[in-house]
């Protein structure tokens, strides 16, 4: 299969999600699959890194400056996904690249699955001191994101 992984967090950013995605990519390739990573730009990345990593223009997220959010290049990402003839999209975020992955899957009429990595209820207090999104709102937002997916993976029972 030709698999597109869509994530807002990938190396050189340091996180459990980035490590999980790299491990997933490695193991899928060992099984004979071709894996493309669609992720955000990063100033610390060599412009000529692995050709299977597609960087989408991004800016720092206001609440977490070390995390990034894509803001343009969506049509170009669709062209690349079409050119690479993806069979399935696997999103790894509920934010910019996750939404992009869902849109591209619909445009290409291919399945989209999602890994739910983060228990957001534990993080909303960092965004405008919890005044914008309350922990009780998270489940409704997440359900909305996941309503049209073909599958959801949770790496732990807590999440």
Predicted regions and their residues:
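N-terminal subdomain of nucleotide-sugar transferases
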Residues: 1-57, 81
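Active-site proximal beta-strand in glycosyltransferases
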Residues: 3, 88, 105-124, 153
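Alpha-helix capping/helix-boundary segments
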Residues: 43, 96, 158-159
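An amphipathic, basic-hydrophobic alpha-helix
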Residues: 62-88, 97-103, 107, 136, ...
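Short His-centered aromatic/hydrophobic patch
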Residues: 92-97, 116
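Nucleotide-sugar donor phosphate/pyrophosphate-binding loop at the beta->alpha transition
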Residues: 111, 122-144
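A short, active-site helix/loop in glycosyltransferases that binds the activated sugar's phosphate group
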Residues: 145-159
């Amino acid at each position: 299969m030709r698999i597109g992984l869509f994530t807002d967090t990938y190396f050189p950013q340091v996180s459990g999600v980035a490590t999980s995605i790299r491990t997933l990519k490695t193991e899928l390739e060992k099984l004979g699959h071709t894996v493309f990573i669609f992720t955000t730009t990063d100033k610390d990345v060599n412009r000529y890194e692995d050709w299977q990593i597609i960087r989408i223009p991004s800016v720092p997220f206001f609440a977490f400056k070390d995390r990034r959010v894509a803001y343009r290049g969506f049509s170009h990402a669709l062209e690349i996904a079409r050119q690479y003839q993806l069979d399935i999209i696997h999103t790894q975020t509920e934010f910019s690249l996750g939404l992009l992955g869902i849109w591209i899957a619909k445009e290409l009429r291919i399945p989209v699955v999602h890994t739910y990595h983060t228990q957001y209820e534990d993080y909303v207090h960092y965004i405008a001191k919890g005044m914008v999104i309350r922990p009780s709102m998270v489940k409704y937002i997440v359900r909305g994101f996941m309503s049209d997916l073909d599958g959801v993976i949770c790496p732990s029972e807590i999440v």
